[in-house]
């Protein structure tokens, strides 16, 4: 047997009077843990196991993340009442309790704009009245029927006693219901706050043990003038609060602070819905940690009591485990040093590659402190401008193979997974850089030739099938396999082998920036499956592009290709006119499909003789549609 001398004695006590708090008291091998609720106690127990495992070889804590507390008398409190992270590691039910998060899937009886799921077929009975007509794009929140349906949903699924949270939010549409009852409550055309508030107060009185939240977003952006009951609150979306370094002092900071301060007058329960990913590209690293720390300190200062970090959901996202560990630590204490948290995670999980990973990732974080905005819906070029400096990234990517070979077991698998994901970033940088030093191709006179490495990047990305959650690369569920297929089809086996326009500098009306105008003649197709990939998008239903063709003196085929993607208001043209030195020369008529499922490439060609010509003008016109744009990827002249 084991003598008492060799045992740890641990006493556990839940004390609700400790506000959000926890306490550790140590006396030799006697340890007393006190916490204000189950969630903190669970977290505290895992912290303790991790700490003891460092001193006592009988206890294995290797599968637990680094601990934030020490084995001495200590006390503290969680910065927020509610914290969840919508990312693979943050949604893993085996991990949430360990890192002090609320389990998102269990926390909410109704979430976001999901009220319609609850209403089901009955929704049609509670459609809003907009401009005097029944309108299925929005719901009526003063309807007795709506109240009854939510009431029975709660009684049937959650009972009276539990403490679940429910979001009661209008649909993601700009108009509010203005039926007689809603109008009498105070609704106006774009403000649904009065009716929504009334419903929430009524539900909170009917179910005093549950919590009910409105949102501060679109039609409920306006703060109510009523004091809200203690079991109600608001979720404030930070979508319009730019994601960049903040010191709380610029106009955008003040604007967001004012919104929080106004809600603080009517409720103590203010949750923030903030963002931690680029939703158009989950695979390229997104250095959000230092920015998130500044935002958390700012939110806390202005009364926030809960945080929901919206990430990549169940889809793989580069560095997710490390980022989720750091963010969950900052949600407990926003003052913890970010670099130390990153280091402790890499040191534990990546024994071979820890320094190399730490150096590169913190370099990204420091790049993102330049003050440039991080794009929530960004293509590779925007990421490159903000933080992804190509020379740093390519060096890191090229060194990965050695670390994958050297590492073993779990570390090797994780590095291999990261290498696969970052092959997408390498392909995107290569595609965007065309035939320059970082590009996928080399130029040889009027031809471009893909470099042999490009095939390696693709082969590496194809391994994504071996990893969970790596089927899609963005929120719109764009498939990696489809991306690879288009890459092979349009870039590796391009139909433009040689173009006499290669490298010409076109000018355009409306005016284009230098990078965009070069894209038109870089011999590199865009990928129709993703409008971020290589398309020059020009606003309006007409544009003219002028090419300096003096000295070409040849006849051949004029070639131009367009993106047809009506879903994003990008329309292929109906007509293209060519003018030689200002004189009408040729006309091409096109009949693009109305609604292709995915983006499609539309090509137009016509024989042309440019002997003696100095300027070729291309006049492009599409159907007159609201918000129309024209997407072009390549203009070529094939001898």
Q: Where are the model-predicted features located?
A:
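Short beta-strand-plus-loop segments that form exposed binding edges in beta-rich domains
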Residues: 618-626
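Short, well-ordered secondary-structure micro-motifs within conserved domains or adaptor modules
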Residues: 2-20
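Disordered, acidic Ser/Thr/Pro-rich linker "stalks" and the adjacent N-terminal cap
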Residues: 488-555, 561-572, 593-598, 627-638
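Feature activates predominantly on carbohydrate-active enzymes
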Residues: 17-209, 213, 233-236, 260-287
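Short, surface-exposed beta-strand/strand-loop-strand elements in extracellular ectodomains
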Residues: 569-582
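Structured mid-domain segments that build the active-site/substrate or prosthetic-cofactor binding neighborhood
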Residues: 145-146, 254-355, 359
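Catalytic domains of carbohydrate-active enzymes that cleave complex glycans
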Residues: 330-520, 524
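Extracellular carbohydrate recognition and processing domains
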Residues: 585-608
């Amino acid at each position: 047997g084991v003598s008492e001398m060799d045992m740890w004695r641990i006493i556990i006590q839940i004390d609700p009077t400790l506000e959000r708090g926890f306490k550790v008291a140590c006396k030799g091998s006697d340890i007393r843990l006190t916490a204000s609720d189950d969630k903190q106690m669970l977290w505290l127990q895992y912290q303790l196991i991790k700490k003891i495992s460092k001193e006592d070889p009988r206890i294995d804590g290797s599968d637990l993340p680094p601990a934030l507390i020490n084995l001495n008398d200590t006390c503290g409190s969680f910065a927020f009442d509610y914290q969840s992270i919508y990312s693979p590691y943050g949604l893993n039910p085996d991990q949430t309790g360990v890192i002090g998060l609320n389990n998102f899937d269990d926390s909410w009886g109704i979430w976001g704009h999901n009220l319609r799921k609850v209403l089901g077929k009955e929704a049609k009975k509670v459609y809003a009245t907009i401009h005097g007509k029944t309108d299925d794009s929005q719901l009526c929140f003063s309807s007795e029927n709506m109240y009854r349906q939510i009431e029975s949903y709660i009684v049937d699924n959650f009972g009276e006693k539990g403490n679940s949270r429910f979001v009661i939010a209008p649909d993601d549409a700009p108009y509010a219901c203005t039926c007689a009852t809603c109008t009498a409550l105070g609704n106006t055309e774009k403000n649904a706050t009065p009716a929504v508030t009334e419903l929430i107060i009524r539900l909170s009185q009917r179910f005093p043990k549950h919590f009910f939240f409105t949102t501060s977003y679109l039609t409920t952006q306006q703060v109510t003038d009523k004091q809200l009951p203690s079991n109600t609150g608001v979720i404030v979306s930070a979508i319009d609060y730019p994601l960049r370094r903040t010191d709380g002092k610029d106009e955008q900071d003040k604007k967001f602070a004012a919104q929080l301060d106004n809600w603080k007058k009517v409720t103590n329960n203010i949750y923030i819905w903030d963002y931690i990913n680029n939703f158009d590209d989950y695979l390229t690293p997104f250095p959000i940690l230092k920015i998130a720390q500044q935002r958390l300190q700012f939110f806390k200062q202005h009364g926030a009591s809960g945080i929901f970090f919206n990430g990549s959901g169940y889809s793989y996202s580069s560095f997710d485990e490390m980022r989720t560990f750091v963010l969950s630590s900052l949600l407990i204490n926003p003052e913890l040093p970010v670099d130390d948290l990153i280091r402790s995670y890499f040191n534990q999980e990546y024994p071979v590659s820890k320094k190399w990973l730490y150096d590169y990732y913190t370099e990204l974080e420091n790049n993102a402190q330049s003050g440039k905005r991080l794009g929530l819906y960004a293509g590779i070029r925007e990421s490159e401008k903000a933080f992804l400096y190509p020379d740093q990234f390519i060096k890191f990517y090229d060194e990965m193979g050695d670390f994958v070979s050297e590492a073993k077991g779990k570390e090797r698998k994780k590095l291999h997974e990261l290498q696969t994901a970052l092959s997408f970033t390498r392909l995107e940088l290569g595609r965007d850089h065309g035939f320059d030093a970082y590009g996928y191709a080399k130029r040889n006179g009027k031809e471009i030739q893909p470099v042999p490495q490009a095939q390696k990047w693709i082969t590496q990305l194809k391994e994504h099938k071996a990893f969970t959650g790596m089927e899609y690369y963005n929120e719109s569920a764009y498939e990696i396999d489809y991306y690879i297929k288009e890459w092979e089809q349009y870039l590796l086996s391009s139909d433009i082998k040689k173009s006499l326009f290669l490298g010409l500098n076109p000018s355009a009306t409306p005016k284009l920036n230098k990078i965009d105008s070069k894209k038109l003649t870089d011999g590199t197709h865009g990928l129709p499956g993703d409008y971020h990939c290589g398309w020059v998008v020009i606003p309006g239903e007409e544009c003219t592009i002028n090419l300096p063709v003096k000295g070409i003196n040849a006849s051949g085929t004029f070639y131009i290709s367009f993106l047809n993607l009506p879903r994003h208001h990008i329309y292929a043209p109906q007509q293209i006119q060519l003018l030689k030195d200002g004189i009408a020369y040729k006309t091409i008529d096109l009949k693009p499909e109305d609604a292709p499922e995915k983006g499609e490439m539309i090509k137009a060609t016509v024989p042309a003789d440019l002997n003696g010509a100095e300027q070729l003008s291309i006049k492009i016109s599409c159907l007159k549609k609201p918000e129309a744009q024209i997407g072009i990827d390549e203009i070529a002249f094939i001898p």
